[in-house]
Amino acid sequence: MKQTTSAARSEKLDVLFGTPVFAVVIAILCNAMWGSAFPFIKMGYRLFAIETSDTASILCFAGIRFMLGSLLVLAGSVVLEGKLPALPRGKVFAECCALGLWQTCAQYAFYYSAVALLTGAFGGILNSTQSFLGVIFAHFLYGDADRMTPAKALGCVLGFAGVLVGTIGNHGGGSAFGIFAMLLATVIFTLAGPWNKSVTKKADSFAVCFLNLFVGGAALLLIGLAMGGRLGRVTPAGVADLLYLAFICGAGYVIWALLMKNNPVSRIAIFGFVNPVVNVFLSALLNGEPLFRWQYVGALVLVCIGIWLVNKAPAQKEKL
């Protein structure tokens, strides 16, 4: 009876998330949530009284977020599948844990350090390079299955041009180490993509995501604590900020998985341009950062067009 109820629930969700109008609206909202992460992380540092140079406390903050997010992934599995995910065993379990140490721990150790040292606009522009690096890596990794096309190539050129424009005359946008850390986090994210895809073929996707977030988050927290980190000031506003960030990484995964399952990739992925736009506007609204610096506006336009082009290309291929 439980299996029948779970199957019926899953079927209803598939129908709902497969509805074009609903899917587009949710894809925009999902990207808006991810775009809000940078300014909310930065606001979290302020609410918890974490100094930009306090790397240990920054790692503790990141670790708690991802561990909480992993619990939301478990909740998503219960709601959508009617059960907790079956954890893999042996080598696959070890591989999932290793993925967490790489994709969550290593990537976000650099990412969270960069957030402390960069403005939201500049950090978002730098972080957008993951869209273009992913396209380039896919061309060499997957061959004919994901070839570079003229539209993708143009998108990459415009995207990297946007990053260059954003870097020109970097008036207080961020330190050299902040730039390096963000770009390194982007490279780690891009390299983790094919590995993540490979692991999810060997185990339940919810289990893979749970272990990724939990193991990586626990490693960040333990490293931070070992370095003497702590959350200096706990307030209701700070807790709310942390819970929202946990929701983004946990529930965001579940929502995106449903969208990708029930829609053509081209229908959903093109809305990635919403991410940096929301980042810039919320950074101005929540953290008082400048909104209309010419290099940021110009870079944002180029990056958004680039993201749209590299993700629109598959739709053109499907129509042939």
Name each model-derived stretch:
Residues 2, 47-103, 133-137, 188-192, ...:
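Transmembrane alpha-helices of multi-pass small-molecule transport proteins
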Residues 78-123, 127, 163-165, 245-263:
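Specific transmembrane alpha-helical segments of multi-pass solute transporters/efflux pumps
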Residues 2-60, 171-198, 247, 282, ...:
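Glycine-/small-residue-enriched transmembrane alpha-helix faces in small-molecule transporters
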Residues 73, 137, 148-168, 273, ...:
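Hydrophobic transmembrane alpha-helices of multi-pass small-molecule transport proteins
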Residues 29, 33-53, 68, 108-118, ...:
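Juxtamembrane C-cap of transmembrane helices in multi-pass membrane transport proteins
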Residues 31, 39-42, 73, 134-136, ...:
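Transmembrane alpha-helical segments that form core, pore/gating elements
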Residues 64, 104, 108, 122-131, ...:
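Helix-helix packing/entry segments at the starts of transmembrane helices
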